[in-house]
Amino acid sequence: MSIMSDNWIKKMAESKNMISPFVDKQVRARNNQQILSYGLSSYGYDARVSNEFKIFTNTKPSIIDPKKFDQDCLITKISDICIIPPNSFALGTTIEYFKMPRDVIAICIGKSTYARCGIIINVTPLEPECEGHITLEFSNTTPLPAKIYAGEGACQFLFFKGDQPCNTSYLDRYGRYTKQIGVTLPTV
């Protein structure tokens, strides 16, 4: 299994629509202002977070149960900035839509700028033939409110190509988050 380079990522994005919209270079500034970078990098792709967020709140006391998720524990916010309360959590989604090839898996890692501020980003792997916008999980590990910037880089996807296509892909097993659009809540 090999990590794939910028040349391969660009070719797959342009010929197979693996990432859409696709930015073929690192964007680090907008309107002469520094931003959290996004776009193609040497061995990965820095994805942007959209302006749709779901923020956990404790206004309705409940227990978070992944088997019976109660969305009343979330506040939906459409904004260029998301403020995550101290020691809390928010969901976002990528601007980019991904279509994974059958012989490729992608791993997501967080941006160091966010990590150095105590904001941790988690995404499970993009399995072979996974398709859709990717729901991002932001955890504010600090005792202070934390800010997330919509339209800017949030995480980096690294692409690994297997020595042959897998026998059973995410699509073959009817993965529950196939073709998700926007923030997708947990389901079992």
Swiss-Prot record:
SUPFAM superfamilies: dUTPase-like
Domain of life where this protein originates: Bacteria
Reactions catalysed, as given in the entry: dCTP + H2O + H(+) = dUTP + NH4(+)
Active-site residue numbers: E137 (proton donor/acceptor)
Enzyme Commission number(s) of this protein: 3.5.4.13
GO biological process: dUMP biosynthetic process; dUTP biosynthetic process
Binding residues annotated for dCTP, in chain numbering: K111, S112, T113, Y114, A115, R116, T135, L136, E137, Q156, Y170, K179, Q180
Pfam hit, one: DCD
Pathway the protein contributes to: Pyrimidine metabolism; dUMP biosynthesis; dUMP from dCTP (dUTP route): step 1/2
Coiled-coil annotated spans: none
Residues spanning the membrane: none
Similarity comment: family membership: Belongs to the dCTP deaminase family.
Assembly behavior: Homotrimer.
The protein's role, per its UniProt record: Catalyzes the deamination of dCTP to dUTP.
This protein's name: dCTP deaminase
Higher taxonomy: Bacteria, Pseudomonadati, Pseudomonadota, Alphaproteobacteria, Rickettsiales
